[in-house]
């Protein structure tokens, strides 16, 4: 039952993120992105610090943010992040 509630919450969060991103599309094209309190930079790395065959050049430069209102501009949704009991959208570029 708890899994069903969690799954339902994630589905609702996905719908909310899509709705917010559609509403904010016009605003995002007019204003330049400024990191705020709601955005947190996340460094993503795969494998050893020296690099492995799994770590490609494009993955080394991946910058991700935990956003509460959906991804901006050239970012793509790559999952979710959690801060305390709140879930955020993981947006990477």
Swiss-Prot record:
Keywords: Antibiotic, Antimicrobial, Defensin, Disulfide bond, Secreted, Signal
Disulfide bonds: 64-92, 66-81, 71-91
Any Pfam family the entry gives: Defensin_1
GO biological process: cellular response to lipopolysaccharide; defense response to bacterium; defense response to Gram-negative bacterium; defense response to Gram-positive bacterium; response to xenobiotic stimulus
InterPro entries according to UniProt: Alpha-defensin, Alpha-defensin_C, Alpha-defensin_N, Beta/alpha-defensin_C
Highest taxon of source: Eukaryota
Propiece residue ranges: 20-58
Predominant localisation class: secreted
TM helices/strands, residue ranges: none
Keyword Signal: yes
Region (Disordered): 24-54
Compartment list: Secreted
Function according to Swiss-Prot or TrEMBL: Probably contributes to the antimicrobial barrier function of the small bowel mucosa. Has antibacterial activity against attenuated mutants of S.typhimurium.
Protein name, UniProt field: Alpha-defensin 1
């Amino acid at each position: 039952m708890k899994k069903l509630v969690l799954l339902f919450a994630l589905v609702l969060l996905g719908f909310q993120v899509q709705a917010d991103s559609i509403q904010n599309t016009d605003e995002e094209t007019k204003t330049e992105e400024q990191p705020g309190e709601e955005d947190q930079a996340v460094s993503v790395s795969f494998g050893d610090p020296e690099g492995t065959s799994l770590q490609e050049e494009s993955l080394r430069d991946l910058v991700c943010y935990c956003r509460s209102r959906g991804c901006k501009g050239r970012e793509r949704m790559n999952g979710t992040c959690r801060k305390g009991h709140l879930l955020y959208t993981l947006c990477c570029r």
